[in-house]
Amino acid sequence: MKKHIIINLSIAIVVAVMASCQPRNKDTQAVSTEQKETANNQPIQPADSGYADVNGLKMYYEVYGEGKPIVLLHGSFMNIPLNWSHIIPVFAKNRKVIVAEMQGHGRTKDIPREFSYENMADDVSGLLKHLKIDSADILGYSMGGGVAFQFAVRHPEQLRRLVILSGTYKHDGWWPDVEASFATMNADMFKGSPIEKQYDSLGNDPKNFPAYVKKVLSIDVKPYDWSKEVKNIKAPVFIAIGDADGVQYEHALELFRAKGGGKMGDIHGLPKSRLAIIPGTTHIGMMQHMDWIIPMVNDFLDSDLKPTPPTF
């Protein structure tokens, strides 16, 4: 049974990544005309790109657009084009979008240090200092959500608002079968996938791919629990998961309650933090439903977050 689950998880990753590399005509049907045009455009060119020397890494980054800065943090095994190619143009219409490839991912070569959420959060902090950005909104997806949580805990002075898409702040925030699958996944499951092909095409030695997969997976086989620290984050938090996600509902609800949720807003006022459970959406499918999610994110980031609820 476990083997069956793991194989299905691997297939889902490959299929979803392949889909993310293709134009999403079906997905863009529900978006506004403006977003349709953006999503169907050719990828826009960065205003700035390069490598930042941070904590021993040469961290690859790209910057798009103008306005309030938002940093997008990718998921495991991903890179800028795989995770964000259809999303950057939409956010860049009104924001300065900073995207980077974290330790060992994409064009950021690995170094001999522990692969950890804490280290990668410190790298993001260093990148913002390199770019001379005092503070930013942070959006993290999956593994990037864990990095975003740690960024909020370790570098609160650099954070304005926090957006978590399908991320966890403790290891048992995943459904048990998902958590169990991490220990038995391996490089063979990605054979011939866009993940393997992009790893090779971005200047990495193909012989190192199995070691890369093992190191990335190491972050999820070690127990972690930042519940206390995360619940004390002062910045407003928007957490979104799919209703068929790998993240447990109660995990997201626990944080939302700690941030003032779980009460009727018409009586007690609206909390500054927000929660969304996206219907008909898997963990990987979150990236295919960004036409629903981006308007929610923009509203959260642009709102004055006053507690007064709307009236008739």
List PLM regions with ranges.
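C-terminal motif of bacterial Sec signal peptides marking the signal peptidase cleavage site
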Residues: 17-20
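Conserved HGGG/HGGXW glycine-rich cap/lid loop of the alpha/beta-hydrolase fold
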Residues: 57-109
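Active-site loop/oxyanion-hole signature of alpha/beta-hydrolase fold enzymes
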Residues: 99-139
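Flexible "cap/lid" loop of the alpha/beta hydrolase fold
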Residues: 146-154, 160-196
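Active-site nucleophile elbow and catalytic-triad environment of alpha/beta-hydrolase enzymes
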Residues: 213-229
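Short beta-strand/loop motif that positions the catalytic acidic residue
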Residues: 233, 239-241
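Conserved alpha/beta-hydrolase "acid-adjacent" motif
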Residues: 246-254, 286
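Catalytic active-site module of serine/aspartate enzymes centered on a nucleophile-bearing elbow/loop
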Residues: 271-312
